[in-house]
UniProtKB/Swiss-Prot annotation:
GO terms for cellular component: cytoplasm; nucleus. This is Protein SLFN14. Changing residue 248 to A: Reduces endoribonuclease activity. The gene is SLFN14. The keyword Nucleus applies. One of its GO terms (biological process) is rRNA catabolic process. Residues 392-571 are annotated as: Required for ribosome binding. It comes from Homo sapiens (Human). InterPro entries: P-loop_NTPase, Poxin-SLFN/SLFN_N, Schlafen, Schlafen_AlbA_2_dom, Schlafen_AlbA_2_dom_sf, SLFN_GTPase-like. C-terminally truncated SLFN14 endoribonuclease requires manganese and magnesium for its endoribonuclease activity. Expressed in megakaryocytes and platelets (at protein level). Weakly expressed in melanocytes and malignant melanoma cells. It is linked to Bleeding disorder, platelet-type, 20: A disorder characterized by increased bleeding tendency due to platelet dysfunction. Clinical features include epistaxis, hematomas, bleeding after tooth extraction, and menorrhagia. BDPLT20 is characterized by moderate thrombocytopenia and platelet secretion defects. Inheritance is autosomal dominant.
Amino acid sequence: MESLKTDTEMPYPEVIVDVGRVIFGEENRKKMTNSCLKRSENSRIIRAICALLNSGGGVIKAEIDDKTYSYQCHGLGQDLETSFQKLLPSGSQKYLDYMQQGHNLLIFVKSWSPDVFSLPLRICSLRSNLYRRDVTSAINLSASSALELLREKGFRAQRGRPRVKKLHPQQVLNRCIQEEEDMRILASEFFKKDKLMYKEKLNFTESTHVEFKRFTTKKVIPRIKEMLPHYVSAFANTQGGYVLIGVDDKSKEVVGCKWEKVNPDLLKKEIENCIEKLPTFHFCCEKPKVNFTTKILNVYQKDVLDGYVCVIQVEPFCCVVFAEAPDSWIMKDNSVTRLTAEQWVVMMLDTQSAPPSLVTDYNSCLISSASSARKSPGYPIKVHKFKEALQRHLFPVTQEEVQFKPESLCKKLFSDHKELEGLMKTLIHPCSQGIVIFSRSWAGDVGFRKEQNVLCDALLIAVNSPVVLYTILIDPNWPGGLEYARNTAHQLKQKLQTVGGYTGKVCIIPRLIHLSSTQSRPGEIPLRYPRSYRLADEEEMEDLLQALVVVSLSSRSLLSDQMGCEFFNLLIMEQSQLLSESLQKTRELFIYCFPGVRKTALAIKIMEKIKDLFHCKPKEILYVCESDSLKDFVTQQTTCQAVTRKTFMQGEFLKIKHIVMDETENFCSKYGNWYMKAKNITHPKAKGTGSENLHHGILWLFLDPFQIHHADVNGLPPPSAQFPRKTITSGIHCALEIAKVMKEEMKRIKENPPSNMSPDTLALFSETAYEEATCAQALPGVCETKTNLTTEQIANYVARKCHSLFQCGYLPKDIAILCRRGEDRGRYRLALLKAMELIETHRPSEVVFSPATGVWGSHIVLDSIQQFSGLERTVVFGLSPECDQSEEFHKLCFASRAIKHLYLLYEKRAAY
C-alpha cells in the first residue's frame, strides 16, 4: 500500500497530506479505463481524509491531472463523492471544503467531532472490520454498532466470561417445535462424523450458527483465507458456530473439495495460521486465544475418495475478534498510518474508559495524533460548566469597536511601545466587532518555547473574519519567525479543538509583523481558506471564545490567572448556594473549611444570602474576625457591619440578629467568652422568664481545623460539642500545584498530629476526597521552593520574579510577600527595595509596599502570614528565616493564602 506523506512546502499552518496526481471531474472519472488506478486514487484520498479527521484536521493537496480542469465547471467525480458520503453519512459538507489553487485541488478537512444526538463516536472509521452474525449473514459492523458491541463485551467481561448454553441432541429429537438452536445442535452432531457421502443431503440449513461454503475455483486455499476471517470474527463475536466448506448452500448437499485440488494437512495448517493471526482485544484479565477446532471429513463416492469437507467449529469469544485491523487512520510521524485493533478500541472507548494497562501503553502515542477525538484530561471537570459565564464576563461580544485584552498587559505594552496600539488598529481594519487577545507568547501559552525575538503575539477573533495570529517581532530579520508563527497557529488551533472542544470549522492565519511596518514579512505568502472558515456571526464567535477560555484555563499565563480567579469566584458562588440551603433549618452551624476553600469569600456570600432570605437590613448582620486587615477587606466587600473579635467583646450590638464569624481558628478567649456572647445575641432569652428564645438568628462559625492556633484558649466549644457541623471538602479554589502542597501538609499533620489537634478533626481529612475535589476544580499554577538562601538572595529572587510578572501584565495588587514572623518585615523590606531598584522593576519612586490592611489597594502587600489571615492574592511569596521540619506548619499557612503562584523561600539556618 502506497505511503502518504505530509507536504512541508505549502505555507499553511496545517497538517498537509500530498496524495499525488489525481484525475478529477465527473466526466473524466467516468471515462477512466484503468479501474485499479481509479480505486487507488479514491483510496488515497479517503484514507487521507480519515487520518486528518482523526488528527485535528488539515489539508489534502492533490495535483490535478487534467490541465484544463476547473473545479467550478467539472466538479469532483461521483465515485469520490460517494466515498465521502459513506465515510461521513451525516453530511460531508460538515467536514470537507474544496478549493482549486492553480493546478492543485485542496481539500480542507475539519477535525472529527462526535455527533451529540447519537452515540459519541470518538473517531472516524472507513470500516470497523468487527463482524457479527445476523441470521445467515456476517455483518461488518458500522462504527456505532461496533461501539455498542465493545461496551456490551466490556460489561460482560466485568461480570465474568460469557458461557454458551449447551443442549443435548435428544431434546431436539423429542420436540415437535423447531427453533434456530436446533440447527446448532444438528451441526454439532454433523461435526462428530468421520466420513460423508457425495451428494449427501444435510438435515439442517444455514443459520445464525451455521455457514455453508462451496468453492469451484482451483485456488481453494487462497479463497478460504480470504473469506474465513469474516466468518470467524462473526461467529466468535456472536454465539459461536460452524463453517462447513464443501457444502452447497442452496441444495444443502455435500460436494466437497476435490482431493486433487486440496492437501488436507496443508489446508488445516493454513486455516490455523489464518485464525491465529486475527487481531483481538481483551477486556478480561485471562486474555485467551480464539478457541476453534478444524476437522477434515473424507467424502466418498461409491466407496472411492472423492474429496474433503472442512468443518471449522468456532467457540464464542470472551471479548472481541477482528477480521483484520480496523480500516481507520491517523497522522503519525508525518504519515497516514493505520490504527491497530487495540489502538482503535482504546480511542473508540476513550482512554478514560479503557483498561489502565492500555492507557499506559497507548496514551502517549495517541494523544498527539488523534486527541481531536477526545477531551484532554489537562483541565478540571467543572471548567466546561462555567465556560459560557466566563466568556461573557471576560470576553463579552459587543457591537462596539474591537476590544484589546487583557487590559493590564495591553496597558504595559502600549506604554513601553508607543506605536504598537496604532499599528494594531491599522492591522485589524476593517474588523469592527471582535476581540484582540494579547500574550507575551501564545507559543508559551500552548506549550511551546517562548522566543526572545518575539515582543508579543496578538490573536484576532472577529465576526466575518478568519482567526488571525499576529506575531510582533523585535528583530525583523529573525529567520525562525515563519516557523514559530506557523507552529504556534497550528498548535493553538489543535488546542481549541482538543482541549476547548470547539466543533466548528476554524483556521488560524499567522502573520509576522515588525513594529516599524504594517506590511507582512517578505516572502510571506497570503493564505486563502474557504469562506466557511470565517466566523459568520456573534454566536460562532462566542463558541470559539468559550473554547479559548477552556484552553487558557489549562495553561499558565496572565490570561489564565485572570480567568482562574473568576472561575474560582463562580465555584464559590455555587458552593455558597449549596451551603445556604441549610440557613432555614440550621440556625447555628460550625463550618469546617479545609485549606484552599477560601472561606472568607464563602462567608461574604453567605451574609448576602442571609440578607436576601430573611429580608434583613445590612446593620442587622454582623461579621466578626480576628484581624483589622481582614475586617477592612470585608468592609469593602459587603454592606454588612464588620468588626474584630476585640471590638465585638468591647461593644454592644443591640440591632444585630445574625452573626457570621470567620477565621475562628485564630480566636482566643482574651477579653471574654466570645462564643457565648454571640450565641446570646443570636438566641436571646426574655429576661427573668426562662422562656424560649424570642427569635432564632443565624450563628455560623467558619474555621479551618488544620490551622487552629490556640486550641486550649480559643474560646470554641470542644470538637465533640461543635454540632451541628458541616465539613466542606469539595471546594479547592487554587492552583493544582498549591493544592498538592496543602494535601501533603495535611497528610503529614494527620500522620504526626500535634497535641492540640483532636482525633475527630484529623479523621475529617480524606486524601481521596481531597484529590477528587482537586481534579474537579484545581487549575494549573506554579509552586517553587528554594532553600538555604541569604536575605539578599531571597530579595533578588523576589525582585526578578516580580519583574518577569510585571512584564507579562501582572500588577502590584496581584502580589503578596508574606513573612513567617512579623518582626522580619522591616528587614526584608529594605532588602527588597534595594533589589527591585537594581533590577528596574519599577522606577525607585514607584516601589511601594503596603501592610495587609492595604490589601484592597494597588500595591504589593508585605506583611506577616498572621496579619494576612483570611486574605489571598494571585501570587504569594512566603519568606521564612530557616527551613525547619518542626516549623513546616507555616507551609500550609503560606499555601492557603495563594491562588495561582506560590514561591516558598527559606533562609540559611543561623550558625551558633
